[in-house]
Amino acid sequence: MKNITDQLWTRSEPTVIIPPLRRYSLLTNSVQTSFPDQSLSTDELKSRAIDIRKDIVTMIAQGGSGHPGGSLSAVEILSSLYFKVMNHDPQNPKWDLRDKFILSKAHACPVLYVHLAHCGYFPSAELATFRKIDSRLQGHAHIKTPGVEMSGGSLGQGLSFGLGSALSARLDKKESRVYVLLGDGECDEGQIWEAAMAATHYNVDNLVAIVDRNGIQNDTWTKDVMNLEQLADKWRAFGWNTVEIDGHDFTAILSSLEEAKKVKGKPSAIIASTFKGKGISFMENNPDFHGKAPNQEQLQQALSELDNLK
């Protein structure tokens, strides 16, 4: 007799009826199977980012709960990694030589799920099952979902996990790289700095930490909860190669990730300045949408605004 967990994760693919509100932007017959795709232009990445934002707000609205703000702030970061930087194979999620992406701020899982769907790890229709009781797409990323590398929940753990993965790759003489996305509020956690110290001690140069510096945590401003400044100097003091960039500028993101590959003997930290809720006027830089789903009227407005960006 299987327990309930086994039943959830070994079930057949769900039959999903997507409400007539809108269908997800991905066309399943155009899914890529080879990454990274160096042929993608910056304009094509920008166009994909708009579609990804539309899918994020739609799935959260349909799920009735979720974290839109921190998902929308990280779109360009994940699009750069999944489409242009990381070696990965949606047809073989456990490919031994893959690069790994660790979502430490796992409540922002909608941005990860949508990228995984756009890459072909699972059908895009499954996005409509977000937070449903029998879904693989829960409110925090789970390792049994195809393409997810770490089960998340408690903040502060992802950098330690990523460090272990990077060390393991080095011991096995693999050229795999590990990318960890951290929230800036998450940097309040002491475990982040323990991992940061250990990473330089072991000279782990195949590890990159990216801080989504959107300035908001939960329902208020990070500076009012715990002042992190000077954040970049903190990472430098721990011995990391550290750069500060515009986290919505594809050129800056891709350049910083490429430069990180050239750094030897130390890990790299990228402090990416972003706007929570980026791309949607009433969500942008608004703490209210840290963890609140848009209602139907708000969703229609959000989709209209995003369509106007095309």
Tell where the protein language model's regions lie, with residue ranges.
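N-terminal capping segment at the start of a domain
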Residues: 49-65, 212-215
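Cofactor-binding active-site loop characterized by glycine-rich and histidine/acidic residues
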Residues: 59, 71-194, 200-201
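Short, positively charged and aromatic/hydrophobic N-terminal segments
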Residues: 16-17, 22-27
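Thiamine diphosphate
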Residues: 147, 151-154, 159-262
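Intrinsic-disorder-associated, low-complexity terminal segments enriched in Asp/Asn/His/Tyr and depleted
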Residues: 3-6
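Glycine/aspartate-rich loop-and-adjacent alpha/beta segment that forms the canonical ThDP
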Residues: 250-310
